[in-house]
From Swiss-Prot:
Transmembrane region(s): none
Gene name of the encoded protein: yuxK
A Pfam family matched in the record: DCC1-like
Protein family per UniProt: Belongs to the DCC thiol-disulfide oxidoreductase family.
Protein name (record): Uncharacterized protein YuxK
């Protein structure tokens, strides 16, 4: 996939993480205009985007949100995504008032325990036909 084919907003997520997959489903329901596209961190496109962004390709402990060429990780990525959702979810931008080290500490604690608390799949989720167009290969 060339850089011209990459949408303006892409969320990279851990494709085997149940919590992450649930978050993607949550986002899709609240982004009916399809402003955000998705790819797993483990996918060919995800790996390519991680490399281009100078991020490690073997650690899957953070959402990565790429918006208009800017790369965001951890709590900042999550808050940036919420900014595009319909309804009261946009109010999550208020968390930008919390210092980034504190936000990222909480994010990292959840990320570290996500498999223990929510489980994981053996392989990446396959999107249903109705949402497949939102997922990059």
């Amino acid at each position: 996939m060339t850089s011209e084919q990459i949408p303006n907003r892409v969320l990279l997520f851990d494709g085997v993480c149940n919590l992450c997959n649930g978050a993607v489903q949550f986002i899709i329901k609240r982004d009916p205009d399809g402003l955000i596209s998705f790819t797993s961190l483990q996918s060919e496109t995800g790996q390519s985007l991680l490399k281009k962004s100078g991020l490690p390709t073997d650690r899957f402990d953070s959402f990565v949100f790429i918006e208009d060429g800017q790369v965001y990780t951890k709590s900042t990525a999550a808050i940036k995504v919420f900014r595009h959702l319909r309804g009261p979810w946009r109010l999550f931008v208020l968390f930008f008032a919390v210092p980034k080290p504190v936000r990222d500490m909480v994010y990292s604690f959840i990320a570290k325990n996500r498999y223990k608390w929510f489980g994981k799949k053996n392989e990446c989720m396959l999107p249903s036909p109705s949402i497949k167009k939102r997922f990059l290969p």
